[in-house]
Amino acid sequence: MKPSEMRNLQATDFAKEIDARKKELMELRFQAAAGQLAQPHRVRQLRREVAQLNTVKAELARKGEQQ
């Protein structure tokens, strides 16, 4: 999901998206520990998406406070 798409999400959707990505990240970490990780690039991608979601969420919160 692109940051421009993230900015169109509702507040409740941010929590759902972050939780879904963290859950998938946890599953991939278990696979990596077991040596069965098929897509190692997905771990980095998920970490980046979680960070982007948190950043956009904070930006929107700051924008709401300023108005």
Swiss-Prot record:
Entry-linked SUPFAM superfamilies: Ribosomal protein L29 (L29p)
Subunit structure, as described in the record: Part of the 50S ribosomal subunit. Contacts protein L23 and trigger factor when it is complexed with the ribosome.
CDD domains tied to this protein: Ribosomal_L29_HIP (cd00427)
Organism: Deinococcus radiodurans (strain ATCC 13939 / DSM 20539 / JCM 16871 / CCUG 27074 / LMG 4051 / NBRC 15346 / NCIMB 9279 / VKM B-1422 / R1)
Keywords carried by this UniProt record: Ribonucleoprotein, Ribosomal protein, RNA-binding, rRNA-binding
Keyword rRNA-binding set for record: yes
PROSITE patterns: RIBOSOMAL_L29
Purpose: Binds the 23S rRNA. One of the proteins that surrounds the polypeptide exit tunnel on the outside of the subunit.
Entry GO terms, CC: cytosolic large ribosomal subunit
InterPro entries tied to this protein: Ribosomal_protein_uL29, Ribosomal_uL29, Ribosomal_uL29_CS, Ribosomal_uL29_sf
Name the UniProt record assigns to this protein: Large ribosomal subunit protein uL29
Family, as annotated: Belongs to the universal ribosomal protein uL29 family.
